[in-house]
Amino acid sequence: MRKFIFVLLTLLLVSPFSFAMKGIIWQPQNRDSQVTDTQWQGLMSQLRLQGFDTLVLQWTRYGDAFTQPEQRTLLFKRAAAAQQAGLKLIVGLNADPEFFMHQKQSSAALESYLNRLLAADLQQARLWSAAPGITPDGWYISAEIDDLNWRSEAARQPLLTWLNNAQRLISDVSAKPVYISSFFAGNMSPDGYRQLLEHVKATGVNVWVQDGSGVDKLTAEQRERYLQASADCQSPAPASGVVYELFVAGKGKTFTAKPKPDAEIASLLAKRSSCGKDTLYFSLRYLPVAHGILEY
């Protein structure tokens, strides 16, 4: 009987639910510097009370933003406060605002660009590995994988080479999981999109799929077909988890967004994968608990 109980406890301890993440993504912006330390610490404590276990920094550099010493120091302080509140920390690396424009280059030019991007990511990883009072629990590649530019196997070879190298070299800096996110807009079939993510998964990089409900480019039924193909529990789906969008995008050319209604957000926050996949939310500033603290 004791042996049976021991085996049962062991299975529970190693079940996928023991490792599934409930994370909130914070997209650092310069205007967030107006938030006081007290406000931020209170917000991090509220996240823990609401069941979140992880804060994901979408990036720690965006173009030239967050390159000044005082900006970096503030990000370090924000990250340390999250860990002090009991949250794990996934550190986003370098984000290039022109990432999607560079994908239209020749294969050779694209390969050269992705190598430069990797060098910038490694610089951020080394910087944050040495940051005082912080121990990153994982790394997030801030570039996003779309379903337009990597449709053929030939076209995605530079992507896969880059991700293979990124996973290996970032892990050399700190042997923690490496993540990236992906989104779909109907440019591939659901099965084709699943195959793309299977190739990404094979590089060792964990991929999260954005649910697309905030940008609302596809119908709910169309989005569900993509999510079932890429992140479902009924079949071996390649995604490590789903990012649920907590915002409603505006209709203009310039991106604007507002939070979804509180009741809809509450329904999304209650979601949990039935097979232990990660559940993430974008983004912190749209959570009701962040209203009056982070502008949107």
UniProtKB/Swiss-Prot annotation:
Signal keyword on record: yes
Cited Pfam families: DUF4434
InterPro entries: DUF4434
Alphabetically ordered keywords of this record: Signal
GO terms under cellular component: cell outer membrane
Residues annotated as signal peptide: 1-20
A GO biological process held by the record: secretion by cell
Record NCBIfam families: PRK09936.1
Protein name: Uncharacterized protein YbcH
Species this chain originates from: Escherichia coli (strain K12)
Biological classification of the source: Bacteria, Pseudomonadati, Pseudomonadota, Gammaproteobacteria, Enterobacterales
This protein's encoding gene: ybcH
